Design a protein with these regions (language model features):
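An alpha-helical repeat/solenoid feature that recognizes helix-turn-helix modules
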Residues: 1-51, 56-100, 108-134, 146-171
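Glycine- and acidic-rich phosphate- and metal-coordinating loops
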Residues: 141-145
Length: 171
């Protein structure tokens, strides 16, 4: 495993391993509430969590659930996790790792048409000011084929993505 275990983000369960997804959710929330929180604590906590996410970035950009390398093998990034990580790092949109990961996300979507991946990606592209109409069309096509298997999370995120709901995630 190649990661810095000293960098802490957030975990699914208290006192356990820091994962990219819950860390990204927490970062968006904390960044949106930072005006109401102690600035010293927010700056330190956000900075460490951002460093943790960047530390876990896969070779070539993007993220998976928590590790970039295991047993000497580079792991693949996932589009949904990549989009969510980029959403949490949107205030660093011009930084090279973010730009590399945006390009990687575009490539990942060529082979992945899941509702969850498309919805998170559209929200991400919209937050970064990138064109998303092609992906909205792809999401609609995917929904017509699968109805996203009736899963609430991708359906809800797709509705947000199709209606410019990215503002909910703006930090």
């Amino acid at each position: 495993v190649k990661l810095n275990p000293l960098l802490k983000g957030w975990s699914w369960t208290a006192g356990t391993f820091s994962w990219v997804e819950p860390t990204a959710y927490a970062l968006v929330a904390v960044k949106q509430l930072k005006a109401r929180l102690s600035q010293d604590q927010v700056i330190a906590r956000v900075g460490e969590a951002e460093r943790m996410i960047y530390d876990r970035m896969c070779v070539g950009g993007g993220w998976n659930y928590g590790n970039s390398t295991v047993l000497g093998e580079n792991l693949w990034p996932y589009p949904d996790t990549t989009a969510l990580a980029l959403i949490s790092l949107q205030d660093h949109r011009a930084d090279p790792p973010n730009q590399l990961s945006l390009k990687a996300l575009q490539k990942m979507l060529a082979d992945n048409h899941s509702g969850l991946a498309l919805a998170w990606s559209i929200l991400c592209f919209d937050l970064y000011g990138n064109e998303s109409s092609h992906w909205i069309d792809q999401m609609e096509k995917s929904y017509l084929e699968t109805e996203f298997l009736g899963e609430t999370k991708p359906i809800a995120l797709a509705l947000l993505a199709a209606s410019h709901g990215e503002q909910i995630f703006r930090v």
